[in-house]
Amino acid sequence: MGPLGRAWLIAAIFAWALLSARRGLAEEAEASPSPPPSPCPTETESSAGTTGATPPTPNSPDATPEDSTPGATTPVGTPEPPSVSEHDPPVTNSTPPPAPPEDGRPGGAGNASRDGRPSGGGRPRPPRPSKAPPKERKWMLCEREAVAASYAEPLYVHCGVADNATGGARLELWFQRVGRFRSTRGDDEAVRNPFPRAPPVLLFVAQNGSIAYRSAELGDNYIFPSPADPRNLPLTVRSLTAATEGVYTWRRDMGTKSQRKVVTVTTHRAPAVSVEPQPALEGAGYAAVCRAAEYYPPRSTRLHWFRNGYPVEARHARDVFTVDDSGLFSRTSVLTLEDATPTAHPPNLRCDVSWFQSANMERRFYAAGTPAVYRPPELRVYFEGGEAVCEARCVPEGRVSLRWTVRDGIAPSRTEQTGVCAERPGLVNLRGVRLLSTTDGPVDYTCTATGYPAPLPEFSATATYDASPGLIGSPVLVSVVAVACGLGAVGLLLVAASCLRRKARVIQPGLTRARALGSAP
C-alpha cells in the first residue's frame, strides 16, 4: 500500500473514533437527568414565610445579641424562622401548587421540560433553606465600641439613640472593672494590683427627663449626659486610669423589654527607661541600675541586659517591682558583674525593655551607659613644724578635696595641688595642712578625700599627736628641748674626748721612761 493509501486509512479510523465517542456521550446524557433548576427569587421569598406570619414593621428596633440582654423579649412584629426538615421540602400556604403540563399528561420519567431536562420521576428536589428574618435596627449607636486611650487622659465617646422609643424609658449606665489583657510574654511583677476585678457598679440613672440616681462614690470621675435629651448619651471620663478602665454598659428598660449597649475602654502608658552606671573601683567589678518607670498595663514589660552587645545571663541581675496608688507599675533591675581586672576597659552596659501595649502591639526601649572607674587615692598624715600634713596622691583633678576631722572641731586649713600623678596621667597630687590642736593629751587627726560619687566609700587616713604637758609644754618647747638635748650630747662627747686626751698625755712619758730602762745593759 502506498503512502496515500495509508493516509486515507488513518483518517477513516480517526473519524470512526470521533463518532463513537459522540454517541456514548449522548447515551449517558439521556440516562442521567440534570438537577432541577434553582428557584427564582420570588419563589424563595414566598417559601420562607410561615402560615399567618406578618411582615416586620419598618421602625421595629434591632435586637441583636450585642445590643440586647439574654432575657430580652422579641418584638411582636418579628417573624420566626420556619422549621425546615433536613429531608422534606418546606410546605407553605403562600406558594401555589404546580400547574399540570399543557398536554394534560402527568409528568413521568420520559417527559422532558422545555429545556430538555426531565420534569419529574427522576431525582427528588432537595429542600430549600428558609430565608432568615430581617434584623431589627440597633436601638443605640456609638462611634466606637472598643476604645484605647493614653493613661490619665480624658475620654469622650459619642453615643446616641437610633430609634424613637425614648419616652418613659429608664436609662442606666453601669461600669465594671474587669481583668484586662495580661500578656504572658511580660515578666510577672509579683505585687498586688490596687485595682483588681470588681462586680458591676451602677453609675447613673435617668427617667422621665430627670436624674433618678447618681453614684456618690464614683460620680466625680465622669460627666453624665443631660436627662433633658435622652437621645444624646455620650460617655465622658474625666481621667482614664486603672480605676476607670473597664466595661461600660448603657441599658434601656421599656416594660418587659430590655436593651443594652456595651463600650469597652482600656488605657496604657509606655515605660520611661533609663540606665545609671554605678561608679567602680579598679578591679572591683561593674554595676548598673536600669529603671522602667510608671508603665501600664500590668505584666507588660520584659527586660534584658547586654554587655558590649552580648547578652548577660539573668542570674547577674536582680529585679524589684513596685506599684503606686494610681495603679502605675515600675521596675528596677540592678546588674552586678564581678569579672573585672585592674587594667580592663570598662564595658558598655545596655538595658533593653520590651513593652506590650496590647496582645498584638510591642514596642522596644533601650538605654546604655559605661561605668566610671576610679583608682583609690594614697593618703598619708604626718606632723611637721607645728602642723598636721595630709598628702593625697592620684586623685581626680577639680573634683576631690581634703577634709580634716579633729576633736576640737574646725580649724584653719589649706589645700594645694603639688603636681601630677606619675603612675596615672590625668590624676593629680594634693597636700593639705592644718594647725595642731591646743588640746592637751593625745589627739587624732583624720584626713578624708571627699568628692567621690556614691556608692564609693570614703577614703581617709588617721594619725595621733600627743600634746600632754608632762611631755612637752608646747610645740616651741619641743623644738627647744630637742636642740638642747642635741647640744648637751655634743658637749658630753667633747668633754669625754678631752679627758681621754689628757689621760693619754700623762701615760705617754711613763711608758717612754720604762722603755728606756728596759733597754739599758
From Swiss-Prot:
Its subcellular locations are: Virion membrane
Start and end residues of each stretch annotated as Disordered: 24-138
The record lists the membrane-crossing segments as: 476-496
Under Gene3D superfamilies, the record lists: Immunoglobulins
The UniProt record lists the keyword Iron: no
Q: Which residues are glycosylated?
A: N111, N164, N208
Record's signal peptide: 1-21
Cystine residue pairs: C142-C159, C290-C351, C390-C447, C394-C421
- Keyword Zinc set for record: no
Q: Which domain of life is it from?
A: Viruses
- UniProt domain Ig-like V-type: residue ranges: 155-227
Which keywords belong to this entry?
Answer: Disulfide bond, Glycoprotein, Host-virus interaction, Immunoglobulin domain, Inhibition of host complement factors by virus, Membrane, Signal, Transmembrane, Transmembrane helix, Viral attachment to host adhesion receptor, Viral attachment to host cell, Viral immunoevasion, Virion, Virus entry into host cell
Q: Which GO terms describe its biological process?
A: adhesion receptor-mediated virion attachment to host cell; symbiont entry into host cell; symbiont-mediated suppression of host complement activation
Hey, which stretches end up on the Virion surface side? 22-475
Q: What cellular-component terms does GO give this entry?
A: membrane; virion membrane
* Topology within the bilayer: Single-pass membrane protein
Compositional bias of kind Polar residues: 66-76
Give the Cytoplasmic membrane side ranges.
Answer: 497-521
Ranges for the Ig-like C2-type domain? 386-451
Report quaternary structure and partners.
Interacts with host complement component C3; this interaction inhibits host immune response by disregulating complement cascade.
Q: What does this protein do?
A: Essential for the initial attachment to heparan sulfate moieties of the host cell surface proteoglycans. Plays also a role in host immune evasion by inhibiting the host complement cascade activation.
UniProt similarity note: Belongs to the herpesviridae glycoprotein C family.
- What is the name of the protein in this document? Envelope glycoprotein C homolog
Which gene underlies this protein? Answer: gC
